[in-house]
Amino acid sequence: MPPSRNRHSAQRVFTWDKIKMALAAAEEGFYIWNIKTGVIHYTDRCLTMMGASRKEKAPNIFTQPELTIHEEDQAFFSQEVRRYLDGHSHVPMRIEIRMKKLNSKSWSWVRVNGLARRDKQRRPVMLVGVWVNITRRKTAEL
């Protein structure tokens, strides 16, 4: 089979609906942050972890960590994100933080994973990744 035909078959198999199903099965949320514009998009699972909904404007955790990230984790989080974006790494970013649900006093442990897309000058222009709720694991560890 020609390579182009295989590629088109894979594109039909891996539809956005199926990818969303896989993320739901893994209990993971997906985000896309356009670093140039500052605009961030979250899947419903990310919004649920944050205690937000589609009806309200959810904060960008990368530019406004003080709104959702535990105060003891904010500096660490911002530092690790900056280090990753400045480092030109091909290794995915992985940061474990405590995230507060908006309008609530409840906290969850979340692992924020991401990969940067870079321009021709190797500057980060986009960060794409998933959030994983790791509260059960962290509770067992503590």
Predicted regions mapped to residue ranges:
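Sensory-domain boundary/capping and coupling elements
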Residues: 6-18, 126, 138-142
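Generic recognition of well-ordered alpha-helical segments
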Residues: 17, 79-80
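Per-ARNT-Sim (PAS) sensory domains and their PAS-associated C-terminal
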Residues: 72, 76, 85-115, 123-125
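Hydrophobic "anchor" residues
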Residues: 39-40, 107, 124, 131
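PAS/PAC or PAS-like capping segment
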Residues: 72, 134-135
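PAS-family sensory domain signal
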Residues: 14-66, 109-111
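PAS-family sensory domains
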Residues: 1-6, 122-134
